[in-house]
Each structure stands twice: as C-alpha cells, then as structure tokens.
Amino acid sequence: MISSSFEGFRYHKPLPNFYKVENPKNPNNEIPEDLLSYFNELVLKYNFSGLSYSKLSEEFKQEFNIDFDNVIIIKFLMGDNLIKMEKSREKCRLMDDEFQDYGIHVYEFADFLRENGFQADLIHPLADDLSMRAIALQSNDCVITRSNMCLFKDGITVGFFIIHTSIENLPFKSENDMLWVEDFCSTCGVCIDRCPENAFDENEKFQRKLCTAHREGCNDCLLRCPFYKRGYDKVKRRYDRMVKR
C-alpha cells in the first residue's frame, strides 16, 4: 500500500520529495561489483524485474538540456490481472495505483545509494520536458515496437522508473542486440489489423491521439502481440528460424 504521506506522481506537478537520506556532498563515482549485485537483489526483493543502465550521449544531453550522464532504469512488470481487465476508467485507476505502489520503493533505492556515498535522484516519471523512453533507448537494452511500446527482454508489459546517479562504472551496453525486432514487426502487423480505434494512419504509423490506452486502459494490441503471448525468447527463436529459410 502507498504511504498516506506520499503525494504520488502527477502530470504537471513537482516531483514529491520522499527521500529520507540527503545526497552526499562529495559523491563517489565507482561502485564495487558486490555492492551493485546487492543493489540488484534489493530491487528484485520488491518484485521489480531488473535493472538496465544508460550512459547518455552529449547530443542527447544537449537536446533535452540536462547535465547528468549516468542513469539506472528500474523495471517492473505490470500485473497480468490488470492487463487482462476490460478497458474502463476503473482499470486506469488501478493501473495508476500499481504504478504509484512501485514508485514509492524507488525512493528507498535512491536512499540506499545515497547511504553508500553516491548521488542518486529520481527523474520525474511523468515529466513534460524529458522523454523517459528516449532515456531508456540510450541503454541499448530495449526497442520501440510497431505498436509504440517499449520492449525490454523482460517483457512488453514493462513499466520503469529512472534514477540518475554519480556512478560512472555501471555495466553499460555499447550495442543493441534487439534491433531485429523492427524487421519482425514488419512481418507481423497484428497490432494494426486488430486495433479497435484504428490508431494507425494509411502508412501504418501509430497515431497517439487516437489511442485510448491512457484514457480507458485499452491494450488490445498488447494482448495480441507475439511478445506478450509467447515472450521475447520464443519470438526470437521463431525469427531466427524464419531468417534461415
């Protein structure tokens, strides 16, 4: 349950200050491997699905006018029972409750890093001026599907929060091994064919203004997506067999 003192994350509202530990005045920039491993275990303990890491490029920092480099992406899988609910305002409310429940723990993770001598600050997950998905793509650990969803290997139902930190020796990835997904999506198209709102134009490009996912909780495209029905690994094996033919 969400603490009664937690204001929650809201659009157009400042990020709640729910930290219990101050940032160190002279933060460390290298984390021991065993401490990072413990941090990962701590995240999993709270039912998150794992961590990814982004090293933001200079071009990206200039584009969004930010001055931090290193980010930790803290991922969770949205509840299957919610995903399978019929679309409604109530479904949207319950999904927001789930999001807030996970979010309060991210302050605890930031406090843990601060206690161990690192600067750690949560990025507002609903920020107007900064794209969370763009930061996630900098990790080389995800791709955007044809249905405009952010796909990690953890699953297509991943939600995430982001902490920027002074830690410079995080296990960043230099290459993205998921780029094959774009080619696979081009051979599928079930999200386009079965969209009840026809939220794709004549060129099969997603039109956000027509999608009712955020207003009503519609996720028909997700429920029919092979990455949801079969999982990343099975789809990858199927794709590899298809390419070899």
PLM segments and residue spans:
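Non-catalytic, usually N-terminal nucleic-acid engagement modules in DNA/RNA processing proteins
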Residues: M1-K91
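Catalytic cores of enzyme domains
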Residues: K61-N65, D69-N70, K75-R245
